[in-house]
Amino acid sequence: LAANQASSGETDQAIDTLKHAINLIGNTAFLNHGLGALLARKGELDKAHPLFDFAIESDPANLRFILDRISLDIKMGSPDRSQGLINRALALQPYNQETWAYQGLVWRLTGNSKYDWLYDYDVFLRSYTLSVPQGFSSLSRFMEELSHYLSSLHVLTQQPLDQSVVNGTQTMGVLLEDAHPLVQAFKGSLMECVDSYLEELPNNGVHPFLSRLADGYTFSGSWSVKLKKSGHHSNHVHPFGWLSCCSYISVPDMSQSRAGWIKFGETSLNLGSDEWVAKAIQP
């Protein structure tokens, strides 16, 4: 119940539900963590702190508990305090990308030059133009037909509750497994870009991203997002998979305000003057 209330934006009701559950069941790691997460969402960071500590002490191998406590330390202006927990998280899952995102942020906030080593934007960020699939006279014609088909897949009218989409819709399932010829043609062009990207990456056996470079790859997730007026993505990290990419199929006329540009480096933690956009790319 509390999870549904929280997903629907009923934070106060969800807090009351969890407090009632604690009174009935007693203190558990799960309930204390959930209550702490909701209090942190409301900005009551001091109240969330001991609840997260209790959860971690009760279940020290729970990565979610550790990561949320790391986030709390950063929000409270003490990024250096979180390094021990980051080390613990990496010991549990050495390649967890959310953990590395926090590590990079802590390095940046504490002035550690390892941030530039981890986030080498000039090396890791690339933009490509998709090749024209066979049977199409131009890329614009292909994109027009693909956009029309993708729009037909957006049968839901509300934004997903547990995703980064704000004022838009997202398709369900794995898009690139759709057998429609347009989707498969797009997948072929996309794979050409991925292949080019991987060929350009340097070899580095100790870097958490480059050390996972392999001979082949598979797509672990894919979807279509259709944004409405003023629609956007909230800042987020992809914790699963290894490499992320996005393709812009149809975009409105661009203004001079950088509206719709994809940003890198800025967090969702509302860090005020500590926020920083490292790079932005126009679709």
PLM features: residue spans?
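Catalytic core of non-heme Fe(II) oxygenases with the double-stranded beta-helix
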Residues: 177-191, 195-283
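Non-heme Fe(II)/2-oxoglutarate
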Residues: 117-211, 232
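Short coil turns that delineate tetratricopeptide repeat
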Residues: 26-27, 60, 93-95
